[in-house]
């Protein structure tokens, strides 16, 4: 009798994707983040679903409904904080996942990489709209400032902003549509993630050395399922430590004040995971220029495969490129810090220098250093 997992159509599909999948024998813990992102997505959908049962998308009751969830709903506080901090864990895993793709040259799988960039944009849009829903001061002003950036688009900008707002300012219509989009987008993300996996399984996984591993494959189960479970336990441990000991560590105190259109907070800033892009936006004095730089800071990932000049795929044996990569990481941390600081003397200059450095590393220095390495290795 044939094993059911190899004969049943549905089980066969799962088997080919997660059980008998041939995987390189040398992939490291950096390859755990894909499965962790899947877990984060499931966790966010489930906690979000339970929050949506009690939340009301109306400007007069949104803030109160979140308070009600935390105070009166059974275990509402833990669901709310798991959802809020789960978003932070999601972005930590996302940044690690993208960083791993850049370091080990996984971007040469162009279809998988491009779907990944689309996923990144969709997750960022979802997180932004989710931040608006509690209707605190930072929710309201964050929504006003970020949506207002679209007015920089020539000719259609103002009409576009008013169309998104559903009126002449961020109000009830805006909140209702943001809730609708925030609810539907995770399911679109799930579909895109399935396509991401589909393209990945067409080529097979990359590995740290960057060489073809067809001659040395091992089954995904039990080797990598066990490895992924360890990563999962560490993720849940970190998340629960955050939720149970300092749930507001990554939030903004201003968001505990109900939204007031008549009172602007002294310093408007988004969640920590958008601060690097926000710092790039603020470093350019021109509005349209800032918006373009903001979009390009993420969209630049799409041209990384075109700028790959090295004869080697991975950075594993390329010390110059490694130094440059870690400088890029340090630069992104600097931008994140600057994004959270007020717009005044030393921070403006640091932000501008860090922004120039960010684009210079990716567009100019990486290709040059890769070419130098080719000559040093006589390739």
Curated annotation (Swiss-Prot):
Its cofactor is heme b. A ubiquinone binds at residue 201. One of its GO terms (biological process) is mitochondrial electron transport, ubiquinol to cytochrome c. Heme b b566 binds at residues 97, 196. The chain crosses the membrane at residues 33-53, 77-98, 113-133, 178-198, 226-246, 288-308, 320-340, 347-367. Heme 1 (or BL or b562) is low-potential and absorbs at about 562 nm, and heme 2 (or BH or b566) is high-potential and absorbs at about 566 nm. Component of the ubiquinol-cytochrome c reductase complex (complex III or cytochrome b-c1 complex) that is part of the mitochondrial respiratory chain. The b-c1 complex mediates electron transfer from ubiquinol to cytochrome c. Contributes to the generation of a proton gradient across the mitochondrial membrane that is then used for ATP synthesis. This is Cytochrome b. It comes from Viverra megaspila (Large-spotted civet).
């Amino acid at each position: 009798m044939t094993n059911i997992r190899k004969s049943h159509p549905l089980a066969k599909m799962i088997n080919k994707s997660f059980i008998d999948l041939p995987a390189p024998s040398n992939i490291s813990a950096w390859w755990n983040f894909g499965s962790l992102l899947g877990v984060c997505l499931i966790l966010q959908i489930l906690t979000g679903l339970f929050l949506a049962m009690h939340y009301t998308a109306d400007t007069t009751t949104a803030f109160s409904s979140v308070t009600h969830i935390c105070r009166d709903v059974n275990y509402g506080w833990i669901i709310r904080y798991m959802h809020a901090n789960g978003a932070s864990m999601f972005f930590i895993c996302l940044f690690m996942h993208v960083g791993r793709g850049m370091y080990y040259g996984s971007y040469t799988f162009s279809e998988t990489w491009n779907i990944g960039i689309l996923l990144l944009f969709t997750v960022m849009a979802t997180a932004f709209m989710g931040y608006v829903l509690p209707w605190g001061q930072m929710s309201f002003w964050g929504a006003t400032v970020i949506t207002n950036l679209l007015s920089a688009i020539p000719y259609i900008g103002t009409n576009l902003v008013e169309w998104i707002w559903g009126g002449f300012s961020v109000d009830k219509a805006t909140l209702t549509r943001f809730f609708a989009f925030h609810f539907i987008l995770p399911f679109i993300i799930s579909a895109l993630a399935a396509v991401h996996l589909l393209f990945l399984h067409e080529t097979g996984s990359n590995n740290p050395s960057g060489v073809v591993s067809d001659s040395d494959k091992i089954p995904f189960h039990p080797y990598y399922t066990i490895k992924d479970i360890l990563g999962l336990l560490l993720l849940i441990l970190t998340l629960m430590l955050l939720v149970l000991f300092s749930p507001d560590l990554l939030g903004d105190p201003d968001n505990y004040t109900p939204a007031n259109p008549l009172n602007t907070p002294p310093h408007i800033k988004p969640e920590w995971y958008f601060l690097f892009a926000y710092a790039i936006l603020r470093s350019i004095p021109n509005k349209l220029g800032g918006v373009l730089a903001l979009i390009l800071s993420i969209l630049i990932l799409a041209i990384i495969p075109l700028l790959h000049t090295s004869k080697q795929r991975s950075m594993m044996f390329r010390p110059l490129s490694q130094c440059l990569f870690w400088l890029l990481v340090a630069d992104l941390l600097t931008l994140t810090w600057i994004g959270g600081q007020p717009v005044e003397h030393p921070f403006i200059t640091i932000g501008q220098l860090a922004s120039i450095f960010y684009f210079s590393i990716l567009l100019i220095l990486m290709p040059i250093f890769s070419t130098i390495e080719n000559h040093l290795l006589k390739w």
